[in-house]
Amino acid sequence: MTLNPSAKTAFKNNAWNKARIEAVGNSIRTWINGVPCANIWDDMTPVGFIALQVHAIGNAADEGKTVSWKDIRICTTDVERYQTPEAQAAPEVNLIANTISPNEAKEGWTLLWDGKTTDGWRGAKLSTSVSYTHLRAHETRRHL
């Protein structure tokens, strides 16, 4: 929530809160009481089950408290029809290595390097690209 301070105050203790979670493909977006909270791209768990969880209780005085959910709705068909527009999303975090999310691409971001060739590489003080003939491996030494 450090990227989204308004989300920190969205949850209301001792009251019903409305949560919206959109997990579509590698995109996970959340809202609490209409406030965008998280907008994450992550490919770690593309499939799985839905669970309602209460995290560990660290304070003995909190043991036995009641946690309740109501009016749970799950959409598995025609999902795109019910997705919230991008304009109502939290700041985006892309956790998928070496990719650009659709929103990042729309904003003009590109990968610096394709990870396979030297295309896109350039010397720090050069205006030209690097070729294979200029690459040289150096022995790695550890200093203990």
Q: What are the residue ranges of the model-derived segments?
A:
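Single conserved hydrophobic/aromatic residue that forms the stacking wall/gate
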Residues: 134-137, 141-144
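Carbohydrate-interacting regions of secretory-pathway proteins
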Residues: 1-136
